[in-house]
Amino acid sequence: MSLSLKRKDLMIVNMGPQHPSMHGVLRLIVTLDGEDVIDCEPILGYLHRGMEKIAENRSIIQYLPYVTRWDYLATMFTEAITVNAPEFLENIQIPQRASYIRVIMLELSRIASHLLWLGPFMADLGAQTPFFYIFRERELIYDLFEAATGMRMMHNYFRIGGVAADLPYGWMDKCLDFCDYFLQGVVEYQQLITRNPIFLERVEGVGFISGEEAVNWGLSGPMLRASGIQWDLRKIDPYESYNQFDWKVQWQKEGDSLARYLVRVGEMRESIKIIQQAVEKIPGGPYENLEARRFKKAKNPEWNDFEYRFLGKKPSPNFELSKQELYVRVEAPKGELGIYLVGDDSLFPWRWKIRPPGFINLQILPQLVKKMKLADIMTILGSIDIIMGEVDR
């Protein structure tokens, strides 16, 4: 009996879904010819919770605790975009002190997100030591968050018009101490990782994206800047107080997994520079614009001032979203996080569209892994840096 050797026997392998604390509930259906990847189909939706529809049935203040469940490793950014949307829609002014506090919290959150990308990324490549190092630094950031907000994760700290509470006494000194310590940690990472020949063999030239491809696919964040495009919303479209600080956009021109690693490590250095400047320059004054708490809903004449008979409790301070639409965006650790908001003169948004960076960056994965080896899938997927909470929403 002779077997035909002309037909290639392809193998279909399911990768994932993994636990949300690891790579997330992403399923990849991979078609293999030996160890060569022929095709890859991502299956999404395992963590879909209807976040956009929930927003349309809540006021913004009621919805704030939900948004930290999008990207649960960079929760300050989801809170920032949620309060920025109604602030821009209603032209609510932010006190300068509140803006500086927001910048400090956002950059600390950026560092924490990049750290928790770096550790598992290195573990995927077989390097276990950095995985334990990053948790040491991340723990210090979470201690700062806990002292300022009361929560290590899911902070619920941002408010429309400012922040929930001022920074406690001595917090800024601890923050500066962390900055000095962390800069030494970044040097340690680079000595341990960047010049490691085994690491370079795994990432150099793997997952190449040209600048033109990155723009055509709509990529953002480190994925875009690693392909030679110097696009950072903190410089291009400044928000909060970023235009008052001296820092540089981190970018590389190689477009491979190594370039994306170098961009994120460079961003951690720049975040420290921004935090140090913000702490030194932070002005005094209020930390919240209390005008945003005014309840502006007009009385209904049909009730004839008898509302109190039908209300079980006094309504919380809120305001109506005027009948207009806008798109706001921030530079999150993974890319451009945006909100398309449509108001219709009611307390609830008529439309709340989330533009998650991870969802759009993930679309290029099948193209990147084709004609690569099976082991390169985890390298490429790790270099994209996705969180399924924001991908599936």
UniProtKB/Swiss-Prot annotation:
It is found in: Plastid, Chloroplast thylakoid membrane. InterPro entries: NADH_Q_OxRdtase_suD, NADH_UbQ_OxRdtase_49kDa_CS, NDH1_su_D/H, NiFe-Hase_large. Signal peptide: none annotated. GO terms for molecular function: NAD binding; oxidoreductase activity, acting on NAD(P)H, quinone or similar compound as acceptor; quinone binding. GO terms for cellular component: chloroplast thylakoid membrane. Its EC number is 7.1.1.-. SUPFAM superfamilies: HydB/Nqo4-like. It catalyses: a plastoquinone + NADH + (n+1) H(+)(in) = a plastoquinol + NAD(+) + n H(+)(out); a plastoquinone + NADPH + (n+1) H(+)(in) = a plastoquinol + NADP(+) + n H(+)(out). It is a peripheral membrane protein. Gene3D superfamilies: Cytochrome-c3 Hydrogenase, chain B. One of its GO terms (biological process) is photosynthesis, light reaction. Keywords: Chloroplast, Membrane, NAD, NADP, Plastid, Plastoquinone, Quinone, Thylakoid, Translocase, Transport. It comes from the Eukaryota. Pfam families: Complex1_49kDa. Its main location: plastid. Belongs to the complex I 49 kDa subunit family. NDH shuttles electrons from NAD(P)H:plastoquinone, via FMN and iron-sulfur (Fe-S) centers, to quinones in the photosynthetic chain and possibly in a chloroplast respiratory chain. The immediate electron acceptor for the enzyme in this species is believed to be plastoquinone. Couples the redox reaction to proton translocation, and thus conserves the redox energy in a proton gradient. NDH is composed of at least 16 different subunits, 5 of which are encoded in the nucleus. NCBIfam families: PRK06075.1, PRK07415.1. This is NAD(P)H-quinone oxidoreductase subunit H, chloroplastic. It comes from Sorghum bicolor (Sorghum).
